[in-house]
Amino acid sequence: MKKIFIACPFIKFINGTRFINNGFKEFTEELYDLCKEYASDVFLALKREDYGNKPLTNYSCSMDLKEAKNSDIVIAIPDDSMGVAVELGWMSAMKKTIILILNKNQKYTPLIKNIHKITPGKVLFYENGEINCLKDIKETLEYYKNRME
């Protein structure tokens, strides 16, 4: 695989130019590093904008859509993000492989939980923080790496 797109909540964790959830930041940084083991190019909007320190002055949806089009796999942590929902719509319409990271204790619409029925992918559940899902993500990336070779 050449490129992985990481879709996750963004705005709710930014206060001015400060990122306010260190646990989620740690998770996304570890996830990014893990993805770099499997793809030469990894897109994470949080990284592009330095976790709120360097917000884009002229943001355009077309920027993220271009990144999505060029991706082989998306790893999505939808939580309650409408932006991630839009990105999942793009990815499923393009039949991209989607790895969904869902909180076992949160309710999700069937459209999210069952997205793998219309596009390739897998749903992974975590408890007590997203970081506890990294092992499962690694195993899933390994599976898709072998299938895409």
Protein language model features and the residues they cover:
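Conserved catalytic or regulatory cores that recognize and/or transform ribose-phosphate-containing ligands
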Residues: 1-149
